[in-house]
Amino acid sequence: MRLLTYNIRRGGVGREEALLATIASSAPDVVVFQEATEPAVIKRLASGMSMAHCGAMPRYSLGFMSRIRMAHVEWHRPRVSRHAFLELAPEGMPVRIFGVHLSAVFAAITERRRMFELRALLRSIAHHQHGFHVLAGDFNTVAPGELLDVGALPRRVRAAMWVSGGRVRWRTIQIVLESGYIDAFRTRHPADPGLTLPASGPQVRLDYVFLPSTHAARLQQCDVIRSESARAASDHLPLLATLDVS
């Protein structure tokens, strides 16, 4: 199964042709969207890809489209979290997909919020912890040990960091790893920075796919899509993971 996670920025309005070209070039079976605030756009993208199954919940920002029929689709919002997550169960397959979009802005207070949201998500899916599942989406945070060139970031991002004291302890991804997951991209590309934002000249990696280390053998490949259309379609580059779902 080819799984694409893609933040399409502000619903993708006005950029559908570039989005469609980007998605088509990666030939996914399932796409998980972030900032999917315009259901009509998701429907048109699904139609353009001849994908019969799609959905979006504007207030939760998460959507999907798929060639594969889904046995179960649900948007969850943990009671203690501001952000929802999307649950997809492809029919006849042993995998469950959880679409994620954590709070934005690089600041100490928002990193603490992301940690809170992530822990709420992990508690909510604890009954799946031993099964084959995937966390995919825009985590809006930096992985441990990775460098961030603050000077190259947009002014609004630098301003948020300055307000928070200029220092952010990047703990969210560490929590994922300590919870028994592997970072799909980093597993396949130890030396590739894998930067995904901004798409026109990436400076930071915010988009991830994780799966339990007990199912690491099911990961076949994971790549950032760096096509010309991807640089124009959104402010994020999409991430494609290929999984063995036999």
Question: Each predicted region: which residue ranges?
Answer:
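Active site of divalent-metal-dependent phosphoester/diester hydrolases
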Residues: 39, 48, 52-67, 79-82, ...
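His/acidic metal-ligating clusters that form di-metal
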Residues: 115-139
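Active-site-proximal beta-strand elements of phosphoester/diester hydrolases
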Residues: 1-9, 94-104, 136, 236
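Short, Asp-centered acidic motifs that coordinate Mg2+ and/or phosphate
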Residues: 29-30, 132-134, 208
